[in-house]
């Protein structure tokens, strides 16, 4: 009997320590805090043709995504899902920026990219840059892409990673996901980032 009570007491203590100790609520996306570099770039914003950097977005939660306007499915679906998240955030959405970086700058000129992002939430901004700038940014966040031009002058596809990165108000990389269909979960994550600092 005494051993049974001792065992029960030990289990209760473990449960109490678990509740009081590492009680941080898990994220819906994957926590990458400390494993990826801070937000840093210098590119042209398609919406107004201005040259912008991470400093333009300091104080806002930034969602970073790489794709291209001729993408048949993943890109429009991802941006539509993120737009739905912004809609759920209501007025908090003004403190969020979704940056869509094109990996196909040859076709995604400033007017083309501006028109494309116009079809989504107004917090979605298109970014483009020279090949060396794009390469540096994709390497910084370990994003893979490959342009496949089989026949010169004909339509081509671009293979690319579908990772979506989340940065807090200080520009620190916090989360990554490839599942933007979990709109409620992402909305909850973004709200936590908005209130964290």
PLM features: residue spans?
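Bacterial N-terminal signal peptides that target proteins for export
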Residues: 1-9
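C-terminal motif of bacterial Sec signal peptides marking the signal peptidase cleavage site
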Residues: 16-19
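N-terminal "domain-start" segment that seeds a small globular fold
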Residues: 24-54, 80
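Short loop/turn microsegments at loop-to-beta-strand junctions
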Residues: 38-39, 62, 161-163
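Short active-site neighborhood of thiol/selenol oxidoreductases, capturing the structured segment around
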Residues: 53-78, 82
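Structural microenvironment flanking redox-active thiols in thiol-disulfide oxidoreductases
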Residues: 77-137
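Thiol/disulfide oxidoreductase modules built on the thioredoxin-like
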Residues: 133-189
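Extracytoplasmic/luminal low-complexity segments enriched in Pro/Gly and acidic/polar residues
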Residues: 190-197
